[in-house]
């Protein structure tokens, strides 16, 4: 992983208030000195500019989306990360099922990126930002 490339794909900057939940150790090591929270710790809804959750099962993804779906500011960068199909990590998550999880908190998927050989990320935005 080349940090600069991943940060650019995710629109991740040092100045943002970041929440990164359930990330694998390799990803956290990759972030280096970048400051981020791994739990909400009493912060109010709408605190974060960047929210990134990692899940390996659909049930876990839905739980994390419900738990952290409102942690970000309105229209924050909200990323749901899941293992790529056919990769090292076995998972029941597919791109379409991530969409379903986002709908639980009235968001829709807008962008997909590859983080590395193992993880994909799907960005969500509030439903009312969807242009018909």
Language model features with spans:
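Acidic/glycine-enriched edge-of-secondary-structure segments
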Residues: 21-31, 46-62
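Short acidic low-complexity segments
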Residues: 37-48
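Beta-hairpin (beta-strand-turn-beta-strand) motif
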Residues: 56, 82-85, 115, 127
């Amino acid at each position: 992983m080349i940090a600069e490339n991943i940060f650019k794909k995710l629109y991740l900057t040092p100045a943002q208030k970041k929440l990164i939940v359930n990330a694998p150790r390799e990803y956290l090591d990759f972030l280096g000195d970048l400051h981020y929270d791994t739990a909400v710790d009493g912060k109010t809804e709408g605190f974060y500019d960047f929210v990134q959750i990692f899940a390996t099962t659909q049930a876990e993804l839905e739980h994390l989306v419900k738990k952290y779906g409102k942690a970000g500011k309105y229209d924050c960068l909200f990323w749901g990360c899941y293992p790529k199909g056919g990769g090292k990590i076995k998972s029941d998550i597919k791109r379409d099922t991530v969409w379903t999880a986002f709908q639980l908190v009235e968001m829709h998927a807008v962008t997909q990126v590859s983080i590395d050989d193992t993880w994909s990320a799907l960005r969500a935005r509030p439903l009312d930002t969807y242009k018909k």
